[in-house]
Amino acid sequence: MSPVLEWDKAEERIFELGVDRGVFYPYDQQTGEYLEGVVWNGLVNVTEKGAGGEDNKQYADNIVYANIRSEAEFEASIEAFTYPDEMSECDGTSQPEVGVFIGQQLRKPFGFSYRTKIGNNNDNLDFGYKVHMVWGATPEPTEKSRDTINDSPEASTFTWDLATEKVPVTGRKPTAHMWVDSTKVAPAELEALEDLLYGSDSESASFPTPDEVLALFTTP
């Protein structure tokens, strides 16, 4: 006899929240490789947005003859109190002399990783987390508001809307966004990924390709 469905078991009341462990990976457009990662402090929000994937119905013989779906794209936005110095060039800012900045310059792509928490009713926020990786991100122009200081001062935040360029994945369609769920993978495999992304005693932080990430978790 099949078991009766049961809702809201304590260990199954799962939810997600938070964002931390931001890392920025500069991209060398000449070599096509990502450079050593640097910490991105002050993350307030990362919003993941889907784009594309829309129906394009083709009609013939008075019926829908074919339904061609456009390519899905990944877009995102980042809000933060601050950002790494290396981000300036990606945001269209040049520094011709130390401390002197020029806007409206060419924008450069970068890689980005961040972590979101997974909680449940038993372990609260210690249940697990997801490590997200974004390739080929390029910021689009956004507003920067400068407000007067008043009797309820608040620190300003910076925001960036990101377009992405997908990268190859063997056996799958190209992607710009990938994530790993700590509750579903072996701890040793997760540690190997984090050693790459965050650095270790012997290696600097680096940004792997999707295939290199998959190789860490491939079942023998």
Please tell me what each predicted stretch does.
Residues 64-140:
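Structured, beta-strand-rich domain cores
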Residues 2-85, 134-155:
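Solvent-exposed edge beta-strands and adjacent loop segments
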Residues 24-26, 33, 113, 178, ...:
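Intrinsically disordered, low-complexity N-terminal regions enriched in serine/proline/glycine
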Residues 141-220:
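Mixed-charge, glycine-accented linear interaction segment located at domain edges/termini
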Residues 35, 90-91, 160:
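Broad hydrophobic/π-residue packing in well-ordered secondary structure
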